[in-house]
Amino acid sequence: MKKIIICFIFVFSINISFADATSDLIDKIKNIHSMTANFNQKLIDGQTNNNLNSKGNMSLKKPQYFKWITTSPNNQEIVSNGTKLWIYDGDLDQLIIKKVSNDIAQFPYLILLSKNTNNINKLFTVTAQDNNSYILKPKNDQMIDSIKIKFTPNNQLEYLEISTSLNQFTKIEFNNVKTDVDISNTSFDFTAPQDTDIIDETKSA
């Protein structure tokens, strides 16, 4: 009986720690109302041993606005106004327009727009490595193995690490981070340059 009680206490304490970690993470994310930053991204492909480095800038504004601009080595823009998602490839002069997806596997940035603890709990098991680092393990997603979110001591986003089931690892480091900045909603709309090949998937049945 004593062993059963000890086991119950142990399991209960683990559940509390998971809940506390999720709550702490949500509190940090909630405090990011808007944000701009530069980023350096490294993609390591474990299958081919190829590395791909890129850099650019990003901005987000809650509850639904997001922009991710890669300036090197290729010109690519990913912009969302909460309804539509524009994916523009400047090298190919091609624009793909999609409906906004809630698929974390495709768009891990959606975590940064989260404001509902229940949604995080539904999708992930969250553990805290320390006061500023969190590991998110998807409960159902088959593509992502884990996401690590690291904050600075003053609660600014420092980096994201994403490991996938395809043996790929991505680390995105943020610098020149500014939070609670005034960003116009219209900056999250996208107008294609002239002569762009446009594929509008929102019009498909």
Curated annotation (Swiss-Prot):
Cellular component annotations (GO), alphabetically ordered: outer membrane-bounded periplasmic space
UniProt keyword list: Chaperone, Periplasm, Protein transport, Signal, Transport
Subcellular location(s) of the protein: Periplasm
Signal peptide annotation: 1-19
UniProt xrefs under InterPro entries: LolA/LolB/LppX, OM_lipoprot_carrier_LolA-like, OM_lipoprot_carrier_LolA_Pbac
The keyword Zinc-finger belongs to this UniProt entry's keyword annotation: no
Broad class of where this protein is predominantly found: periplasm
GO biological process, one term: lipoprotein transport
Pfam families linked: LolA (PF03548)
Family: Belongs to the LolA family.
Subunit structure: Monomer.
Function: Participates in the translocation of lipoproteins from the inner membrane to the outer membrane. Only forms a complex with a lipoprotein if the residue after the N-terminal Cys is not an aspartate (The Asp acts as a targeting signal to indicate that the lipoprotein should stay in the inner membrane).
Identification of the protein by name: Outer-membrane lipoprotein carrier protein
Gene that this sequence comes from: lolA
